[in-house]
Every structure is written in C-alpha cells, then in structure tokens.
Design a protein with these regions (language model features):
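Transmembrane catalytic cores of multi-pass membrane glycosyltransferases
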Residues: 211-338, 345, 355-358
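Hydrophobic/aromatic-rich transmembrane helices and adjacent perimembrane loops
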Residues: 218-223, 357-385, 396
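Signature aromatic-anchored transmembrane alpha helix within multi-pass, membrane-resident enzymes
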Residues: 254-268, 381-413
C-alpha cells in the first residue's frame, strides 16, 4: 500500500510541476510596471474564458462581450459559469479558478487512468503504462517529400499531445477528457459485470461531459456504435459456423442490450441538447460549427493529417500489433479499446474529406495517449511473450520511447518554461488595468467600446463592457471588422462619414485609444473622460 501511495505522489508531483513551472517562472520575472495575467495557451481563448468566469459570479448565462451586436444570453460555456460560482463562494480570483480547474481535472484524469489500467492490465504493468501515457511524446520535427508533396511532422499548436500541453489542457477540454476515461472505465466494468449500475454511471458521466464539451462524448458514442457493428462482423467472418450465431447471441444478451440502450440514450440526448443550444441561441452560436469547419478545412490547412498522426509518436505503430492480434482473437473489449484510440484519426479524415461537418482539429480531444498507451502495453506484452529473455525486448522498447521523451522535455523547456518575450499578451502594462478600473466604475454594464484587437482580447476579462472586436469566433464578419479597426486606430485614414458610420452602426459609447495623436476629424465625435500616459478613453457624441 505504501509503495503504491509513493508512486501516486511521485507521478502527481511531476505532473503538477510540469503544469505550474512556466507560471512560477513568469511570476518571478514580472518586469516593473507590468502585470502578469497568467495567460494559458491561446491568449484570446484564455481571456474569453476569464470573461465568462467573471460573469458567472453573478449570472447563470453569459452575454457575449466580444461583439457590439445584440446577442442572446447563453449557457454554451456552462463549465466556466460554474467556475464563476465557485470563485465567488471561495473568494479566489478568476485566473485562480481557471488554474484550479486544470489541477482538479489533472487529478481526476490521473485517478481514472489508474483505475482503467488496473482494470485492463496486471498490477505489475501499472508503472510502465503510466510512464508511456504521461511521458511518451510526439515524433520529432522532420520534413520529407511524398509524391512531390512536402510532408512535415511536428507538434502543432492544435495537437495538444506534447508533454506540457497534454498535462495542461484548457480546463473544460481537460475535465471532459478526464470524464471520458471514467466513462470508458465504467463501460468496460459494465461489460464484465453485466450489471445495470455501471451502465447508469457510465451514461451519467458521459452525459455530464457532453454538457461541458461534447467532442470526447461524441468520440465515445461513435466508438461504441462502431464496436457493436464490427465485433459481430468479425465473429461472423472468423468463427466456426456452428458457433457464429451462438457467440454473438451470448454477448448481445438482454442485460448487455439494456445497458447499451441506457448509455447510448443518455449520450445521444445530451449531444442533441448541446447541438440545439447552439442552434436556438442565435448568433454567434448558431453559426459556430459551420464557421469552425470552413475555417480549418483541408484546403486552408493542407497535409496536417501527417502532423496529427505524428503527434501520437510511436503509439500507432505498436497498436498495429494489437490490431492484428484482435483480428485473430477478437474480443469486444479489445475492439472497443482500439476504436476509441483510433477514432479521433478516423473522424479527422472524415472531416477533412467533407463527410463530417465538424472542425477536424477538434478531434485532438479524446485522451489518445491513455487509450493508445494501454493498447501499446498490451502489444508490448505480446512482443515480450515471444522471447525467452524478457529483458532484451523490454530494454529495446524502453530505448524506443526515451529519445522522444527527451526531445519533448527539451522543447517544453525552450518553448514553455523559458521567457523569450516580455512585450506580449502575458505581461500587460499596469496602466491598462487602471483604465479597466475606470470603465468598471464609470460606465454601464455591457456598454459598447471601440478598441484595437490586441487590447479587445484582454478588456472583457477585466471589465463589464462589450468590445467591437477581440475574438474571431464571437462576432460576425470578423475579418471585415478587423480591417475597419486597423483603419480607425492605425492607418487613421477614415473620413467624417466613415467615422460616424463605425461609431453609430455599432452603438459605440466609448473609444479606447492608445495609438498616438487623435486625428482632428475623430475629435469631432468624442471627448476625453480618462487619460493616463498614452491611454485615453473617449466618450462618444453619437
């Protein structure tokens, strides 16, 4: 027992260190006159989620603060509204609630990973499996040509499979990924016990996950349906004729079918609820799925499938061994495990091919290293079983994983731990927060502010105002507005009619100016109400 506790503490300490070391390093190095906002991953998304947490302190619905258009309040980001309630009750800051959610998700992720390993593998394989799941890494960067096409394998900003990003996913992605592992655990437990209780728990967990982020639940749902089709097909094609019908009937008995109906019903209903939420809430949510799909479709991001595949490192190649074994000795468990490990890749290809209108890069969220790592260990056990000397293949496979782990940790140090730029969206001049305090104390809630894009991403996280532009997904005609914003603030070439139009059509009440001298034409439409160094906030006269 003490040995097991030691290893759990050991692993969690390593994981939490990897998660928080970049943050601690930056807290210690904040330049004078600047504030470190603890930006996590993509700064636009981070500030957006902070704005929802901020609203969640007092509301059960969010107003889109990243557009000046009229939008319906929504509960699309229900996870962050919950975090807002927790932050209000506990008295912690929005960013602390955000990082607290990552920490809790990491612990749940680890807990269900251990339970799933213990369910599927002998106890002695626990530590090797954890090492592969958490320390294996994507393939290193390299480029080659295939039929005159340049193919690059590297970890992309969207794959999330390098060591650091695997342990610090965006909170709702991480939390639902952790619940996905719990869902798989109870699903396999149900298959073994043939009792309804694990099936109900499985359905409730996947249903809960769907309400927060539907992609992991969708991967699970499709994997279960595919396994229910593929398993009897393999049995029918491979079994001795008198046993075919009997073997299929024994597995799909009344108890199994009842549990499957419960699991699938809860999963489908919650998936449908989330989809209807997006469709019924109006802009921008009703167009979100199509916008994402069109933006990240294959023509705009060609050949990324190779990056997606290489992001799994050597795991897919070990899974091939288990795949062959499963064809020869099929069981529903092995088929399902292979499917849920491979399903993100299959769905990615369906999306890239135009068959499935869901953003293809969404399918990185499915805990692939957990299922792939367990499948890899199963394959390794098969390999080792063929040798009289067990040490040689074990050592070979260990050395196979080691270089990638070393490269990934080196990349983590260079890309994430080291500070390479102090003039970015992490270290914000403190005067911008003084301007935010002014807006909070002197403007009406959800009043519209015209602001440059780079500051528009930040402001809603710290004020109650709506901004003209700040996030690609949250406003109509983003690129058109982006061009107009650049003309207004940086090119400063708008005539009187254009200034009146951008202020009037968007019901702009305040202008946040940090772009040097104000053009004379602009001054006809606004008057200063706040001034601090190079920042001026104007009240419009429209």
């Amino acid at each position: 027992m003490m040995k097991r506790i030691f290893w759990h503490i050991f692993f969690l300490t390593i994981f939490l260190t990897i998660l928080y070391l970049p943050v601690i390093n930056r807290i210690k190095a904040v330049p004078p006159g600047k504030t470190y906002t603890k930006v996590h991953r993509i700064f636009e998304d981070y500030y957006y989620y902070l704005s929802v947490i901020r609203q969640g302190r007092g509301n059960w619905a969010e107003v889109d603060q990243y557009t000046t258009e009229k939008t319906n309040p929504s509960r699309v980001h229900l996870f962050y509204l919950f975090l807002g309630k927790i932050a209000r009750i506990t008295g912690i800051s929005d960013s602390d609630a955000y990082y607290g959610a990552i920490t809790v998700s990491l612990i749940i992720f680890y807990f269900y990973t251990c339970r799933l390993i213990r369910l599927l593998l002998p106890e002695k394989w626990m530590i090797p499996t954890l090492l592969i799941i958490y320390l294996a890494a994507p393939l290193p960067d390299f480029t080659f040509y295939l039929f005159d096409k340049k193919i690059t394998t590297t970890y992309g900003w969207w794959t999330n499979t390098d060591i650091y990003h695997r342990l610090s996913l965006i909170p709702h992605h991480f939390f639902t990924g952790a619940l996905l592992i719990g869902t798989v655990f109870y699903f396999i437990l149900y298959l073994r016990q043939k009792k309804i209780k694990p099936a109900i728990i499985c359905g409730l967990i996947t249903g809960t996950a769907n309400l927060f982020f539907a992609v992991p639940g969708f991967i699970f749902l499709v994997s279960v349906i595919a396994a229910c089709i593929i398993f009897p097909a393999i049995i029918y094609l491979s079994a001795i004729k008198p046993l075919k019908k009997n073997k299929i009937q024994v597995f799909f008995n009344r108890q199994i079918l009842t549990g499957l109906i419960i699991i699938l019903a809860l999963s489908v209903l919650t998936q449908a609820f989330v989809y209807l939420q997006l469709k019924l809430l109006g802009h921008p949510w009703s167009d979100n799925l199509i916008w994402e799909y069109n933006t990240y479709h294959a023509e705009r991001f060609p050949y990324q499938f190779f990056i997606f595949l290489s992001s799994y490192g050597i795991l897919p190649y070990l899974m091939i061994i288990l795949f062959v074994n499963t064809i020869l000795k099929p069981t529903f468990e092995k088929i399902f495990l292979l499917l849920i490990g491979m399903m993100p890749t299959i769905l990615y290809l369906l999306s890239a091919g135009g068959i499935l209108t869901i953003n293809k890069i969404r399918f990185v969220y499915g805990a692939p290293y957990v299922f792939g790592g367990i499948a890899a260990i199963m394959a390794i056990r098969l390999i080792i079983g063929k040798f009289h000397n067990k040490l040689i293949p074990a050592l070979f496979l260990f050395l196979l994983f080691l270089p990638n782990t070393f490269i990934s940790l080196k990349n983590y140090r260079e890309r994430d731990v080291k500070i390479t730029n102090y003039n970015n969206n992490e270290f914000i001049p403190t005067i911008y927060f003084e301007a935010a305090d002014f807006l909070n104390g002197n403007t009406e809630e959800f009043s519209n502010v015209l602001i440059p894009f780079n500051i528009g991403t930040l402001l809603p996280a710290y004020t109650h105002n709506k901004v003209y532009i700040g996030h690609e997904v949250s406003t109509a005609d983003f690129w058109g507005k982006y061009a107009l914003s650049n003309r207004f603030f940086y090119e400063k070439d708008m005539n009187r009619d254009e200034v009146q139009k951008i202020l009037g059509n968007n019901r702009i009440e305040y202008v946040f100016w940090d772009s040097g001298p104000l053009p004379e034409i602009y001054s006809e439409f606004m008057a200063p109400v706040f001034r601090k160094e190079h920042i001026v906030i104007y009240k419009t006269k429209i």
